[in-house]
């Protein structure tokens, strides 16, 4: 028996808020991503990997399960009286950049182990899109081993930029912006290494096999992305530029 299980359950919260009365040159209320040394925005990386032995004749049961449940909430909120005297743009911004990866698979091919794989990928702006595909196969002869891999990704991402009330007066432009850039991958492989070689080829020699193996690969992805930019009713906005 060779079984591997990896589970991540996480919550990431980022809040930037201003309350009360303030007078300044310009204001930037931002719940967003830090920058690297070159000034480029970074991204959150959330990764779960589970690797087990292959399901083959000399392994009775081999399985890998990777479960990735992650919630991200970025909020930029203004509620008060703000006056910006500079012509430079003032803004309220919530922005999320993230890459979510879930992988489950066997550590190596064993003689006679057929393979199956299942993967789902998605990219989202304010909403998420995903696609799923899967296959499994087995051989036939003397002994039988069972190998299975399962990958589950549940990702809920929100970015809220909001002016909840008060009076906003700016000499320049005023913007309320919400952005989500989300890349998601759920990759599952049974019987073969979850990491292929540089050419994406398997090195398993399946000719003249003497054993049988039953492999299954299942991937499930549930992704929700919601980006909201709002100026609440009752809020007064007086801008010298564009809104």
Q: Which residues are covered by each model-predicted region?
A:
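Low-complexity, glycine- and small/polar-enriched segments
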Residues: 1-243
């Amino acid at each position: 028996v060779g079984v591997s299980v990896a589970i991540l359950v996480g919550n990431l919260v980022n809040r930037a808020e201003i309350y009360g009365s303030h007078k300044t040159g310009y204001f930037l209320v931002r719940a967003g991503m830090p920058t690297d040394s070159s000034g480029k925005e970074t991204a959150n990386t959330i990764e779960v990997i589970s690797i087990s032995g292959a399901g083959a004749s000399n392994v009775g049961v081999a399985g890998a399960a990777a479960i990735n449940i992650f919630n991200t909430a970025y909020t930029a909120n203004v509620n008060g009286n703000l006056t910006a005297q500079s012509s430079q743009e003032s803004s309220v911004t919530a922005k999320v950049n993230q890459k979510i990866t879930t992988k489950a698979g066997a550590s190596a091919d064993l003689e006679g182990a057929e393979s199956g794989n299942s993967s789902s990928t998605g990219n989202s702006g304010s909403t998420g899109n995903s696609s799923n595909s899967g296959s499994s196969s087995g051989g036939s002869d003397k002994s039988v081993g069972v190998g299975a891999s399962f990958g589950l990704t549940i990702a809920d991402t929100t970015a809220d930029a909001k002016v909840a009330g008060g009076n906003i007066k700016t000499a320049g432009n005023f913007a309320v912006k919400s952005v989500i850039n989300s890349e998601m991958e759920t990759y599952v492989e049974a019987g073969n290494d979850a990491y292929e070689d540089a050419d994406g080829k398997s090195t398993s020699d399946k000719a003249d096999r003497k054993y049988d193996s039953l492999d299954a690969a299942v991937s499930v992805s549930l992704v929700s992305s919601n980006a909201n930019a709002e100026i609440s009713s009752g809020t007064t906005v007086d801008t010298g530029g564009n809104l």
